[in-house]
């Protein structure tokens, strides 16, 4: 599996951990469901935080695809830190994370 990262990854611990979890989940899903060989990550700083786009070179998602356990758990982690997560399944899988710098307090 190849992973191509464009931009930089935030070094703030909470943001970096969620980004890592997202990339790992997308690699797993690319192998299991899309039968792809490459995951593309775009990560860039925006006002107040970071935006991350993740997609792959695999097969188009089946009609009616939805978030499973791994993506749902990722969504919970993102929202717990005050971020947003968008998933799109058409025409290709796309995961978008918007993560604030600082997040929420423990």
Residues covered by each model-derived region:
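Conserved transmitter core of two-component histidine kinases
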Residues: 1-8, 51, 85-88
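Conserved short strand/loop->alpha-helix "switch" segment adjacent to the catalytic nucleotide/phosphoryl-transfer site
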Residues: 2-23, 65
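Conserved ATP-binding N-box helix of the HATPase_c
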Residues: 16-39
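Short beta-strand/loop element within the Bergerat-fold HATPase_c
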Residues: 38-48, 55
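Glycine-rich acidic phosphate-binding loop
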Residues: 55-61
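Short C-terminal beta-strand
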Residues: 91-103
